[in-house]
Amino acid sequence: MHRFLVFVFAVGMTASVQAQSLAEAYRDYWYTGVSVNQWQVEADLSGQNKHDVTGFISGDQTKDWDIIARNFNFVVAENCMKCEVVHPQEGVYDFTLADQFVNKAKAAGMRVLGHALIWHSQCAPWFHFDKDGKPVSREVLKKRMREHIYTIVSHFKGRVDAWDVVNEGFEDDGTPRKSLFWQILGTDYIPLAFQYAHEADPNAELYYNDFSMNKPTKVEGVCRFFRPLIEQGLPVTAIGMQGHMILEDNVDNSVIKQYDHSINTIAALGVPTFFSELDLSVLPNPYGFSGANINDRFSYSPEKDPFKNGLTKEKEAEINQFWVDFYKMLISHKDNIIRVNFWCLNDANSWRNDFPIKGRTDYATLFDRQNQPKGMVQEIINLVQPQQTTKKNKRK
């Protein structure tokens, strides 16, 4: 498909103040991040809303960047660093949007993740084909991959701290995804991508990232693939789990228990993990749907959009309890987690409103449609706040 300080928000002439942000509260544990779309930066710079590279826009983004800078210490671009944007044609690179995003983030003192170097989706159409429309040879694709990765990583060297090197390379059953990269290069494309990225910037952290990593078959398949490569010295800093969750799936805390297992499975490789794209859909799940494959789409029906006019108190309480329980699980694994990253700043611009059913009203993020932190944010902070004076500072 793969970031919080004092909560002081301006909405009109009013302000809502929270004593401490998640990033501050959890600075001894991990980085706390969020995904950012280019229009959030552009709206801040121009004072008006802008469309992102996909044409999507929702809500008022003119204050988003201020909230992001106040409340997160790690950011990732949702779209503007992907292949179809920065490398749309062979030999043609456009870093305009990506540079603007990275420069803005570094000026605010935040760490930056580049997302993503090699991904079958949103890869420019020319990448795998020759001028006659036929698949290129192994050697041509390796050359294109190397040039693509070297050029992008070198351009951002010293500014981008980490990269999602390969994104979504496995199916839910733990077998390699039969993408065009796989069809031409087999699974060799994965270690080659890490090799090229490390050569281009030896100091950058390098990640593998995927969805449905709560499923035992998938996380075990991914780890089975990476184990010998890591043992042979492949520069893999961490294995990431996206964490696109659905509330109704969490019967008896089953989703949380699955992620508990997955963290242990990855830790057994000798590398840490991170959550790269956390959100929680509270809407009914279409039959047969799971994961975050962006090609999965379903038709709209009113019964699949029950909270169009707002959540019930019971549903709000259920959501709050989920996040508290989820964070309790994360805290128990604090030595094996390096980052907890949320996908989209607020409910208004969450992709969940349009995936996998377009036009619904979801409540998937930590901030409401007015950019106010939801009640569970303080509850999550309270899990560790009393400990801050006794723990050694781990994250600056």
Task: Give residue spans per PLM region.
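Sec-dependent N-terminal signal peptides
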Residues: 4-13
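N-terminal carbohydrate-binding accessory modules
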Residues: 19-74, 88, 386
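Noncatalytic carbohydrate-binding groove/subsite architecture in carbohydrate-active enzymes
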Residues: 24-27, 37-58, 180-300
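Acidic (Asp/Glu)-rich catalytic clusters
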Residues: 25-27, 62-73, 99-111, 153-157, ...
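Substrate-binding cleft and catalytic face of glycoside hydrolase catalytic domains
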Residues: 38-39, 70-88, 97-214, 282-286
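Alpha-helix N-cap and loop-to-helix initiation/capping positions
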Residues: 90-96, 132-144, 179-189, 217, ...
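Aromatic-rich peripheral "rim/lid" segments of glycoside hydrolase catalytic domains that contact
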Residues: 155, 164, 169-184, 196, ...
